[in-house]
Design a protein with these regions (language model features):
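Short coil-to-beta microelement around the adenine-binding A-loop and adjacent beta1/P-loop entry
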Residues: 14-15, 69
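Helix-to-loop junction immediately C-terminal to a conserved catalytic motif
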Residues: 48
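The feature captures the beta-strand-to-loop junction immediately N-terminal to the Walker
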Residues: 30-35
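Conserved ABC transporter NBD signature motif
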Residues: 56-67, 71
């Protein structure tokens, strides 16, 4: 169960989410539709614990996701833009993510980079 309770998130003078409340039952699939700047990605970032809501809370399976290592290890968020540390390559990014995610599989990373001819 995903619960969003009165979530508000602002950036300077722009309010991306304004008192958003919704419940998504286990096994349900929803899509979000909206124009650029409507708050879709912001809501997903709050749900994945990347952003902290200014007000309200995001709860998954009864657990608040922000600053919760256990829950973050169970979630993945793939943004529409790639994130790389300045000057980083794939191996340094893999090392970075392995330091954040306990279940990051370096052997699988190496296998996939070889399979797809990446370096």
């Amino acid at each position: 169960m995903i619960e969003v309770k009165g979530v508000t998130k602002s950036f300077d003078d722009f309010t991306a989410l304004d008192n958003v409340t919704c419940n998504i039952a286990e096994g349900c699939i929803y899509g979000m539709v909206g124009s650029n700047g409507a708050g879709k990605s912001t809501l997903l970032r709050v749900l994945s614990g990347i952003y902290k809501a200014d007000k309200g809370e995001a709860i998954i399976d009864g657990i608040n996701v922000y600053e919760n290592t256990y829950m973050k290890n169970k979630l993945v968020f793939v943004a529409d833009e790639l994130f790389f540390l300045a000057g980083a390559n794939m191996k340094s990014m893999a090392k970075f993510y392995s330091s954040i995610y306990d279940n990051f599989d370096m052997d699988r990373f190496t296998e996939l980079t070889k399979t797809f001819g990446l370096d």
